[in-house]
């Protein structure tokens, strides 16, 4: 068995030299016990017994290649590396009938967006999507597959927003651009053929933060969203909860990433860590739209997102909370290489639509 696994390890290394995507898809086909053994051979020493075995293998490969964390001292280089990694795992995209890049002429400045429509001849609700990436990296291409899955399986239009990134812009500018994009959707609801003016916001990680901050700021405004989908959102820059210390090493999101994000998004712009502009858990939660909150069990952000969901419920907000215990931060971005991640993301898409329909 050891000889066989060593040979497979060498095969995986060869595939890695050619491209991360083929290697990852080969890993995903292995039985769980084989993945566990391979993770050990690759040197993954972190004790997370309940973590998905495929994720262990992928993290072992990342660490072996010296890629720990995704945000570093050079934001531009961090963006390049993140874009490269996401490009490396791409394969055939989920089919959506209409995908179009458009320009949004907003009061805060012109930005780009990508519009997905699974049935262009039908009126459908629209989901305004803000991508993750610590407010520093990411864009339309890095989250293209996620948006395609949301459009197809939630049966909604998706407008993915290419908002300006920190540290070049302040949180005030970034959030204003995202709120202006939501207002633009409402103002153009007839041209977009939005079913019964049904508009919601969604995002992963930093995008979840943006979604719920925008939702708070737009309460009682004409363009207030009807629902919010928050996928492992960051909502509290000030506090450090037990999950931060339990899962800050050997996983996708590290304590180093959190420190850099805090520096680029808060400290450099003199924003207090408990300002609701960046930490919505300290904001006014009254009259917030129904919230569908997703967490990953092995994630530094797990506890703050769970606490936020409790706060929403205590403030009378209709809320659904769902945890994926064996997953870590960023799992929805692994859909091109992980069947389980894709299954979970499809499940989230379908269940969110049911939740939205029930609470609209």
Predicted segments with their positions:
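A glycine/proline-hinged amphipathic helix-loop "lid/cap" segment
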Residues: 1-115, 357-360
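Alpha/beta-hydrolase superfamily serine-hydrolase fold, recognizing
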Residues: 9-26, 98-114, 118-360
């Amino acid at each position: 068995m050891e000889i066989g696994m060593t040979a497979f390890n060498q095969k995986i290394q060869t595939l890695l030299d050619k491209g991360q995507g083929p290697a990852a898809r080969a890993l995903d086909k292995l039985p769980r016990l084989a993945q566990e053994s391979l993770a050990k051979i690759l040197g993954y020493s972190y004790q997370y017994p309940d973590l998905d075995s495929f994720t262990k293998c992928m993290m072992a490969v990342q660490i072996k290649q010296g890629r720990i964390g995704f945000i570093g001292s050079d934001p531009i280089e961090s963006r390049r590396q993140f874009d490269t990694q996401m490009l490396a795992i791409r394969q055939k995209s989920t089919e959506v009938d209409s995908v179009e890049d458009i320009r949004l002429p907003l009061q805060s400045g012109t930005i780009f967006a990508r519009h997905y429509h699974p049935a262009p001849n039908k009126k459908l609700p629209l989901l305004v999507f803000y991508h993750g990436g610590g407010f520093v990296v990411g864009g339309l291409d890095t989250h293209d597959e996620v948006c395609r899955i949301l459009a197809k399986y939630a049966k909604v239009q998706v407008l993915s927003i290419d908002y300006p990134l920190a540290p070049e812009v302040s949180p005030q500018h970034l959030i204003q651009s995202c709120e202006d994009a939501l207002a633009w959707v409402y103002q153009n609801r007839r041209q977009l053929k939005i079913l019964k003016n049904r508009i919601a916001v969604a995002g992963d990680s930093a995008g979840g933060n943006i979604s719920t901050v925008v939702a708070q700021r737009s309460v009682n405004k004409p363009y207030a969203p009807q629902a919010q989908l928050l996928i492992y959102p960051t909502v509290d820059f000030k506090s450090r909860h037990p999950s931060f210390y339990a899962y800050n090493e050997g996983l996708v999101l590290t304590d180093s990433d959190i420190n850099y994000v805090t520096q680029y998004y808060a400290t450099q712009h003199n924003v207090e860590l408990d300002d609701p502009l960046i930490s919505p858990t300290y904001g006014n939660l009254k009259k917030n739209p129904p919230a569908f909150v997703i967490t990953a069990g092995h994630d530094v952000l797990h506890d703050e997102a769970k606490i936020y969901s409790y706060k929403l419920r205590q403030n009378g907000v209709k809320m659904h909370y769902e945890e994926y215990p064996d997953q870590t931060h960023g799992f929805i971005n692994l859909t091109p290489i992980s069947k389980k991640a894709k299954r979970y993301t499809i499940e989230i898409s379908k269940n969110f639509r049911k939740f939205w329909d029930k609470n609209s």
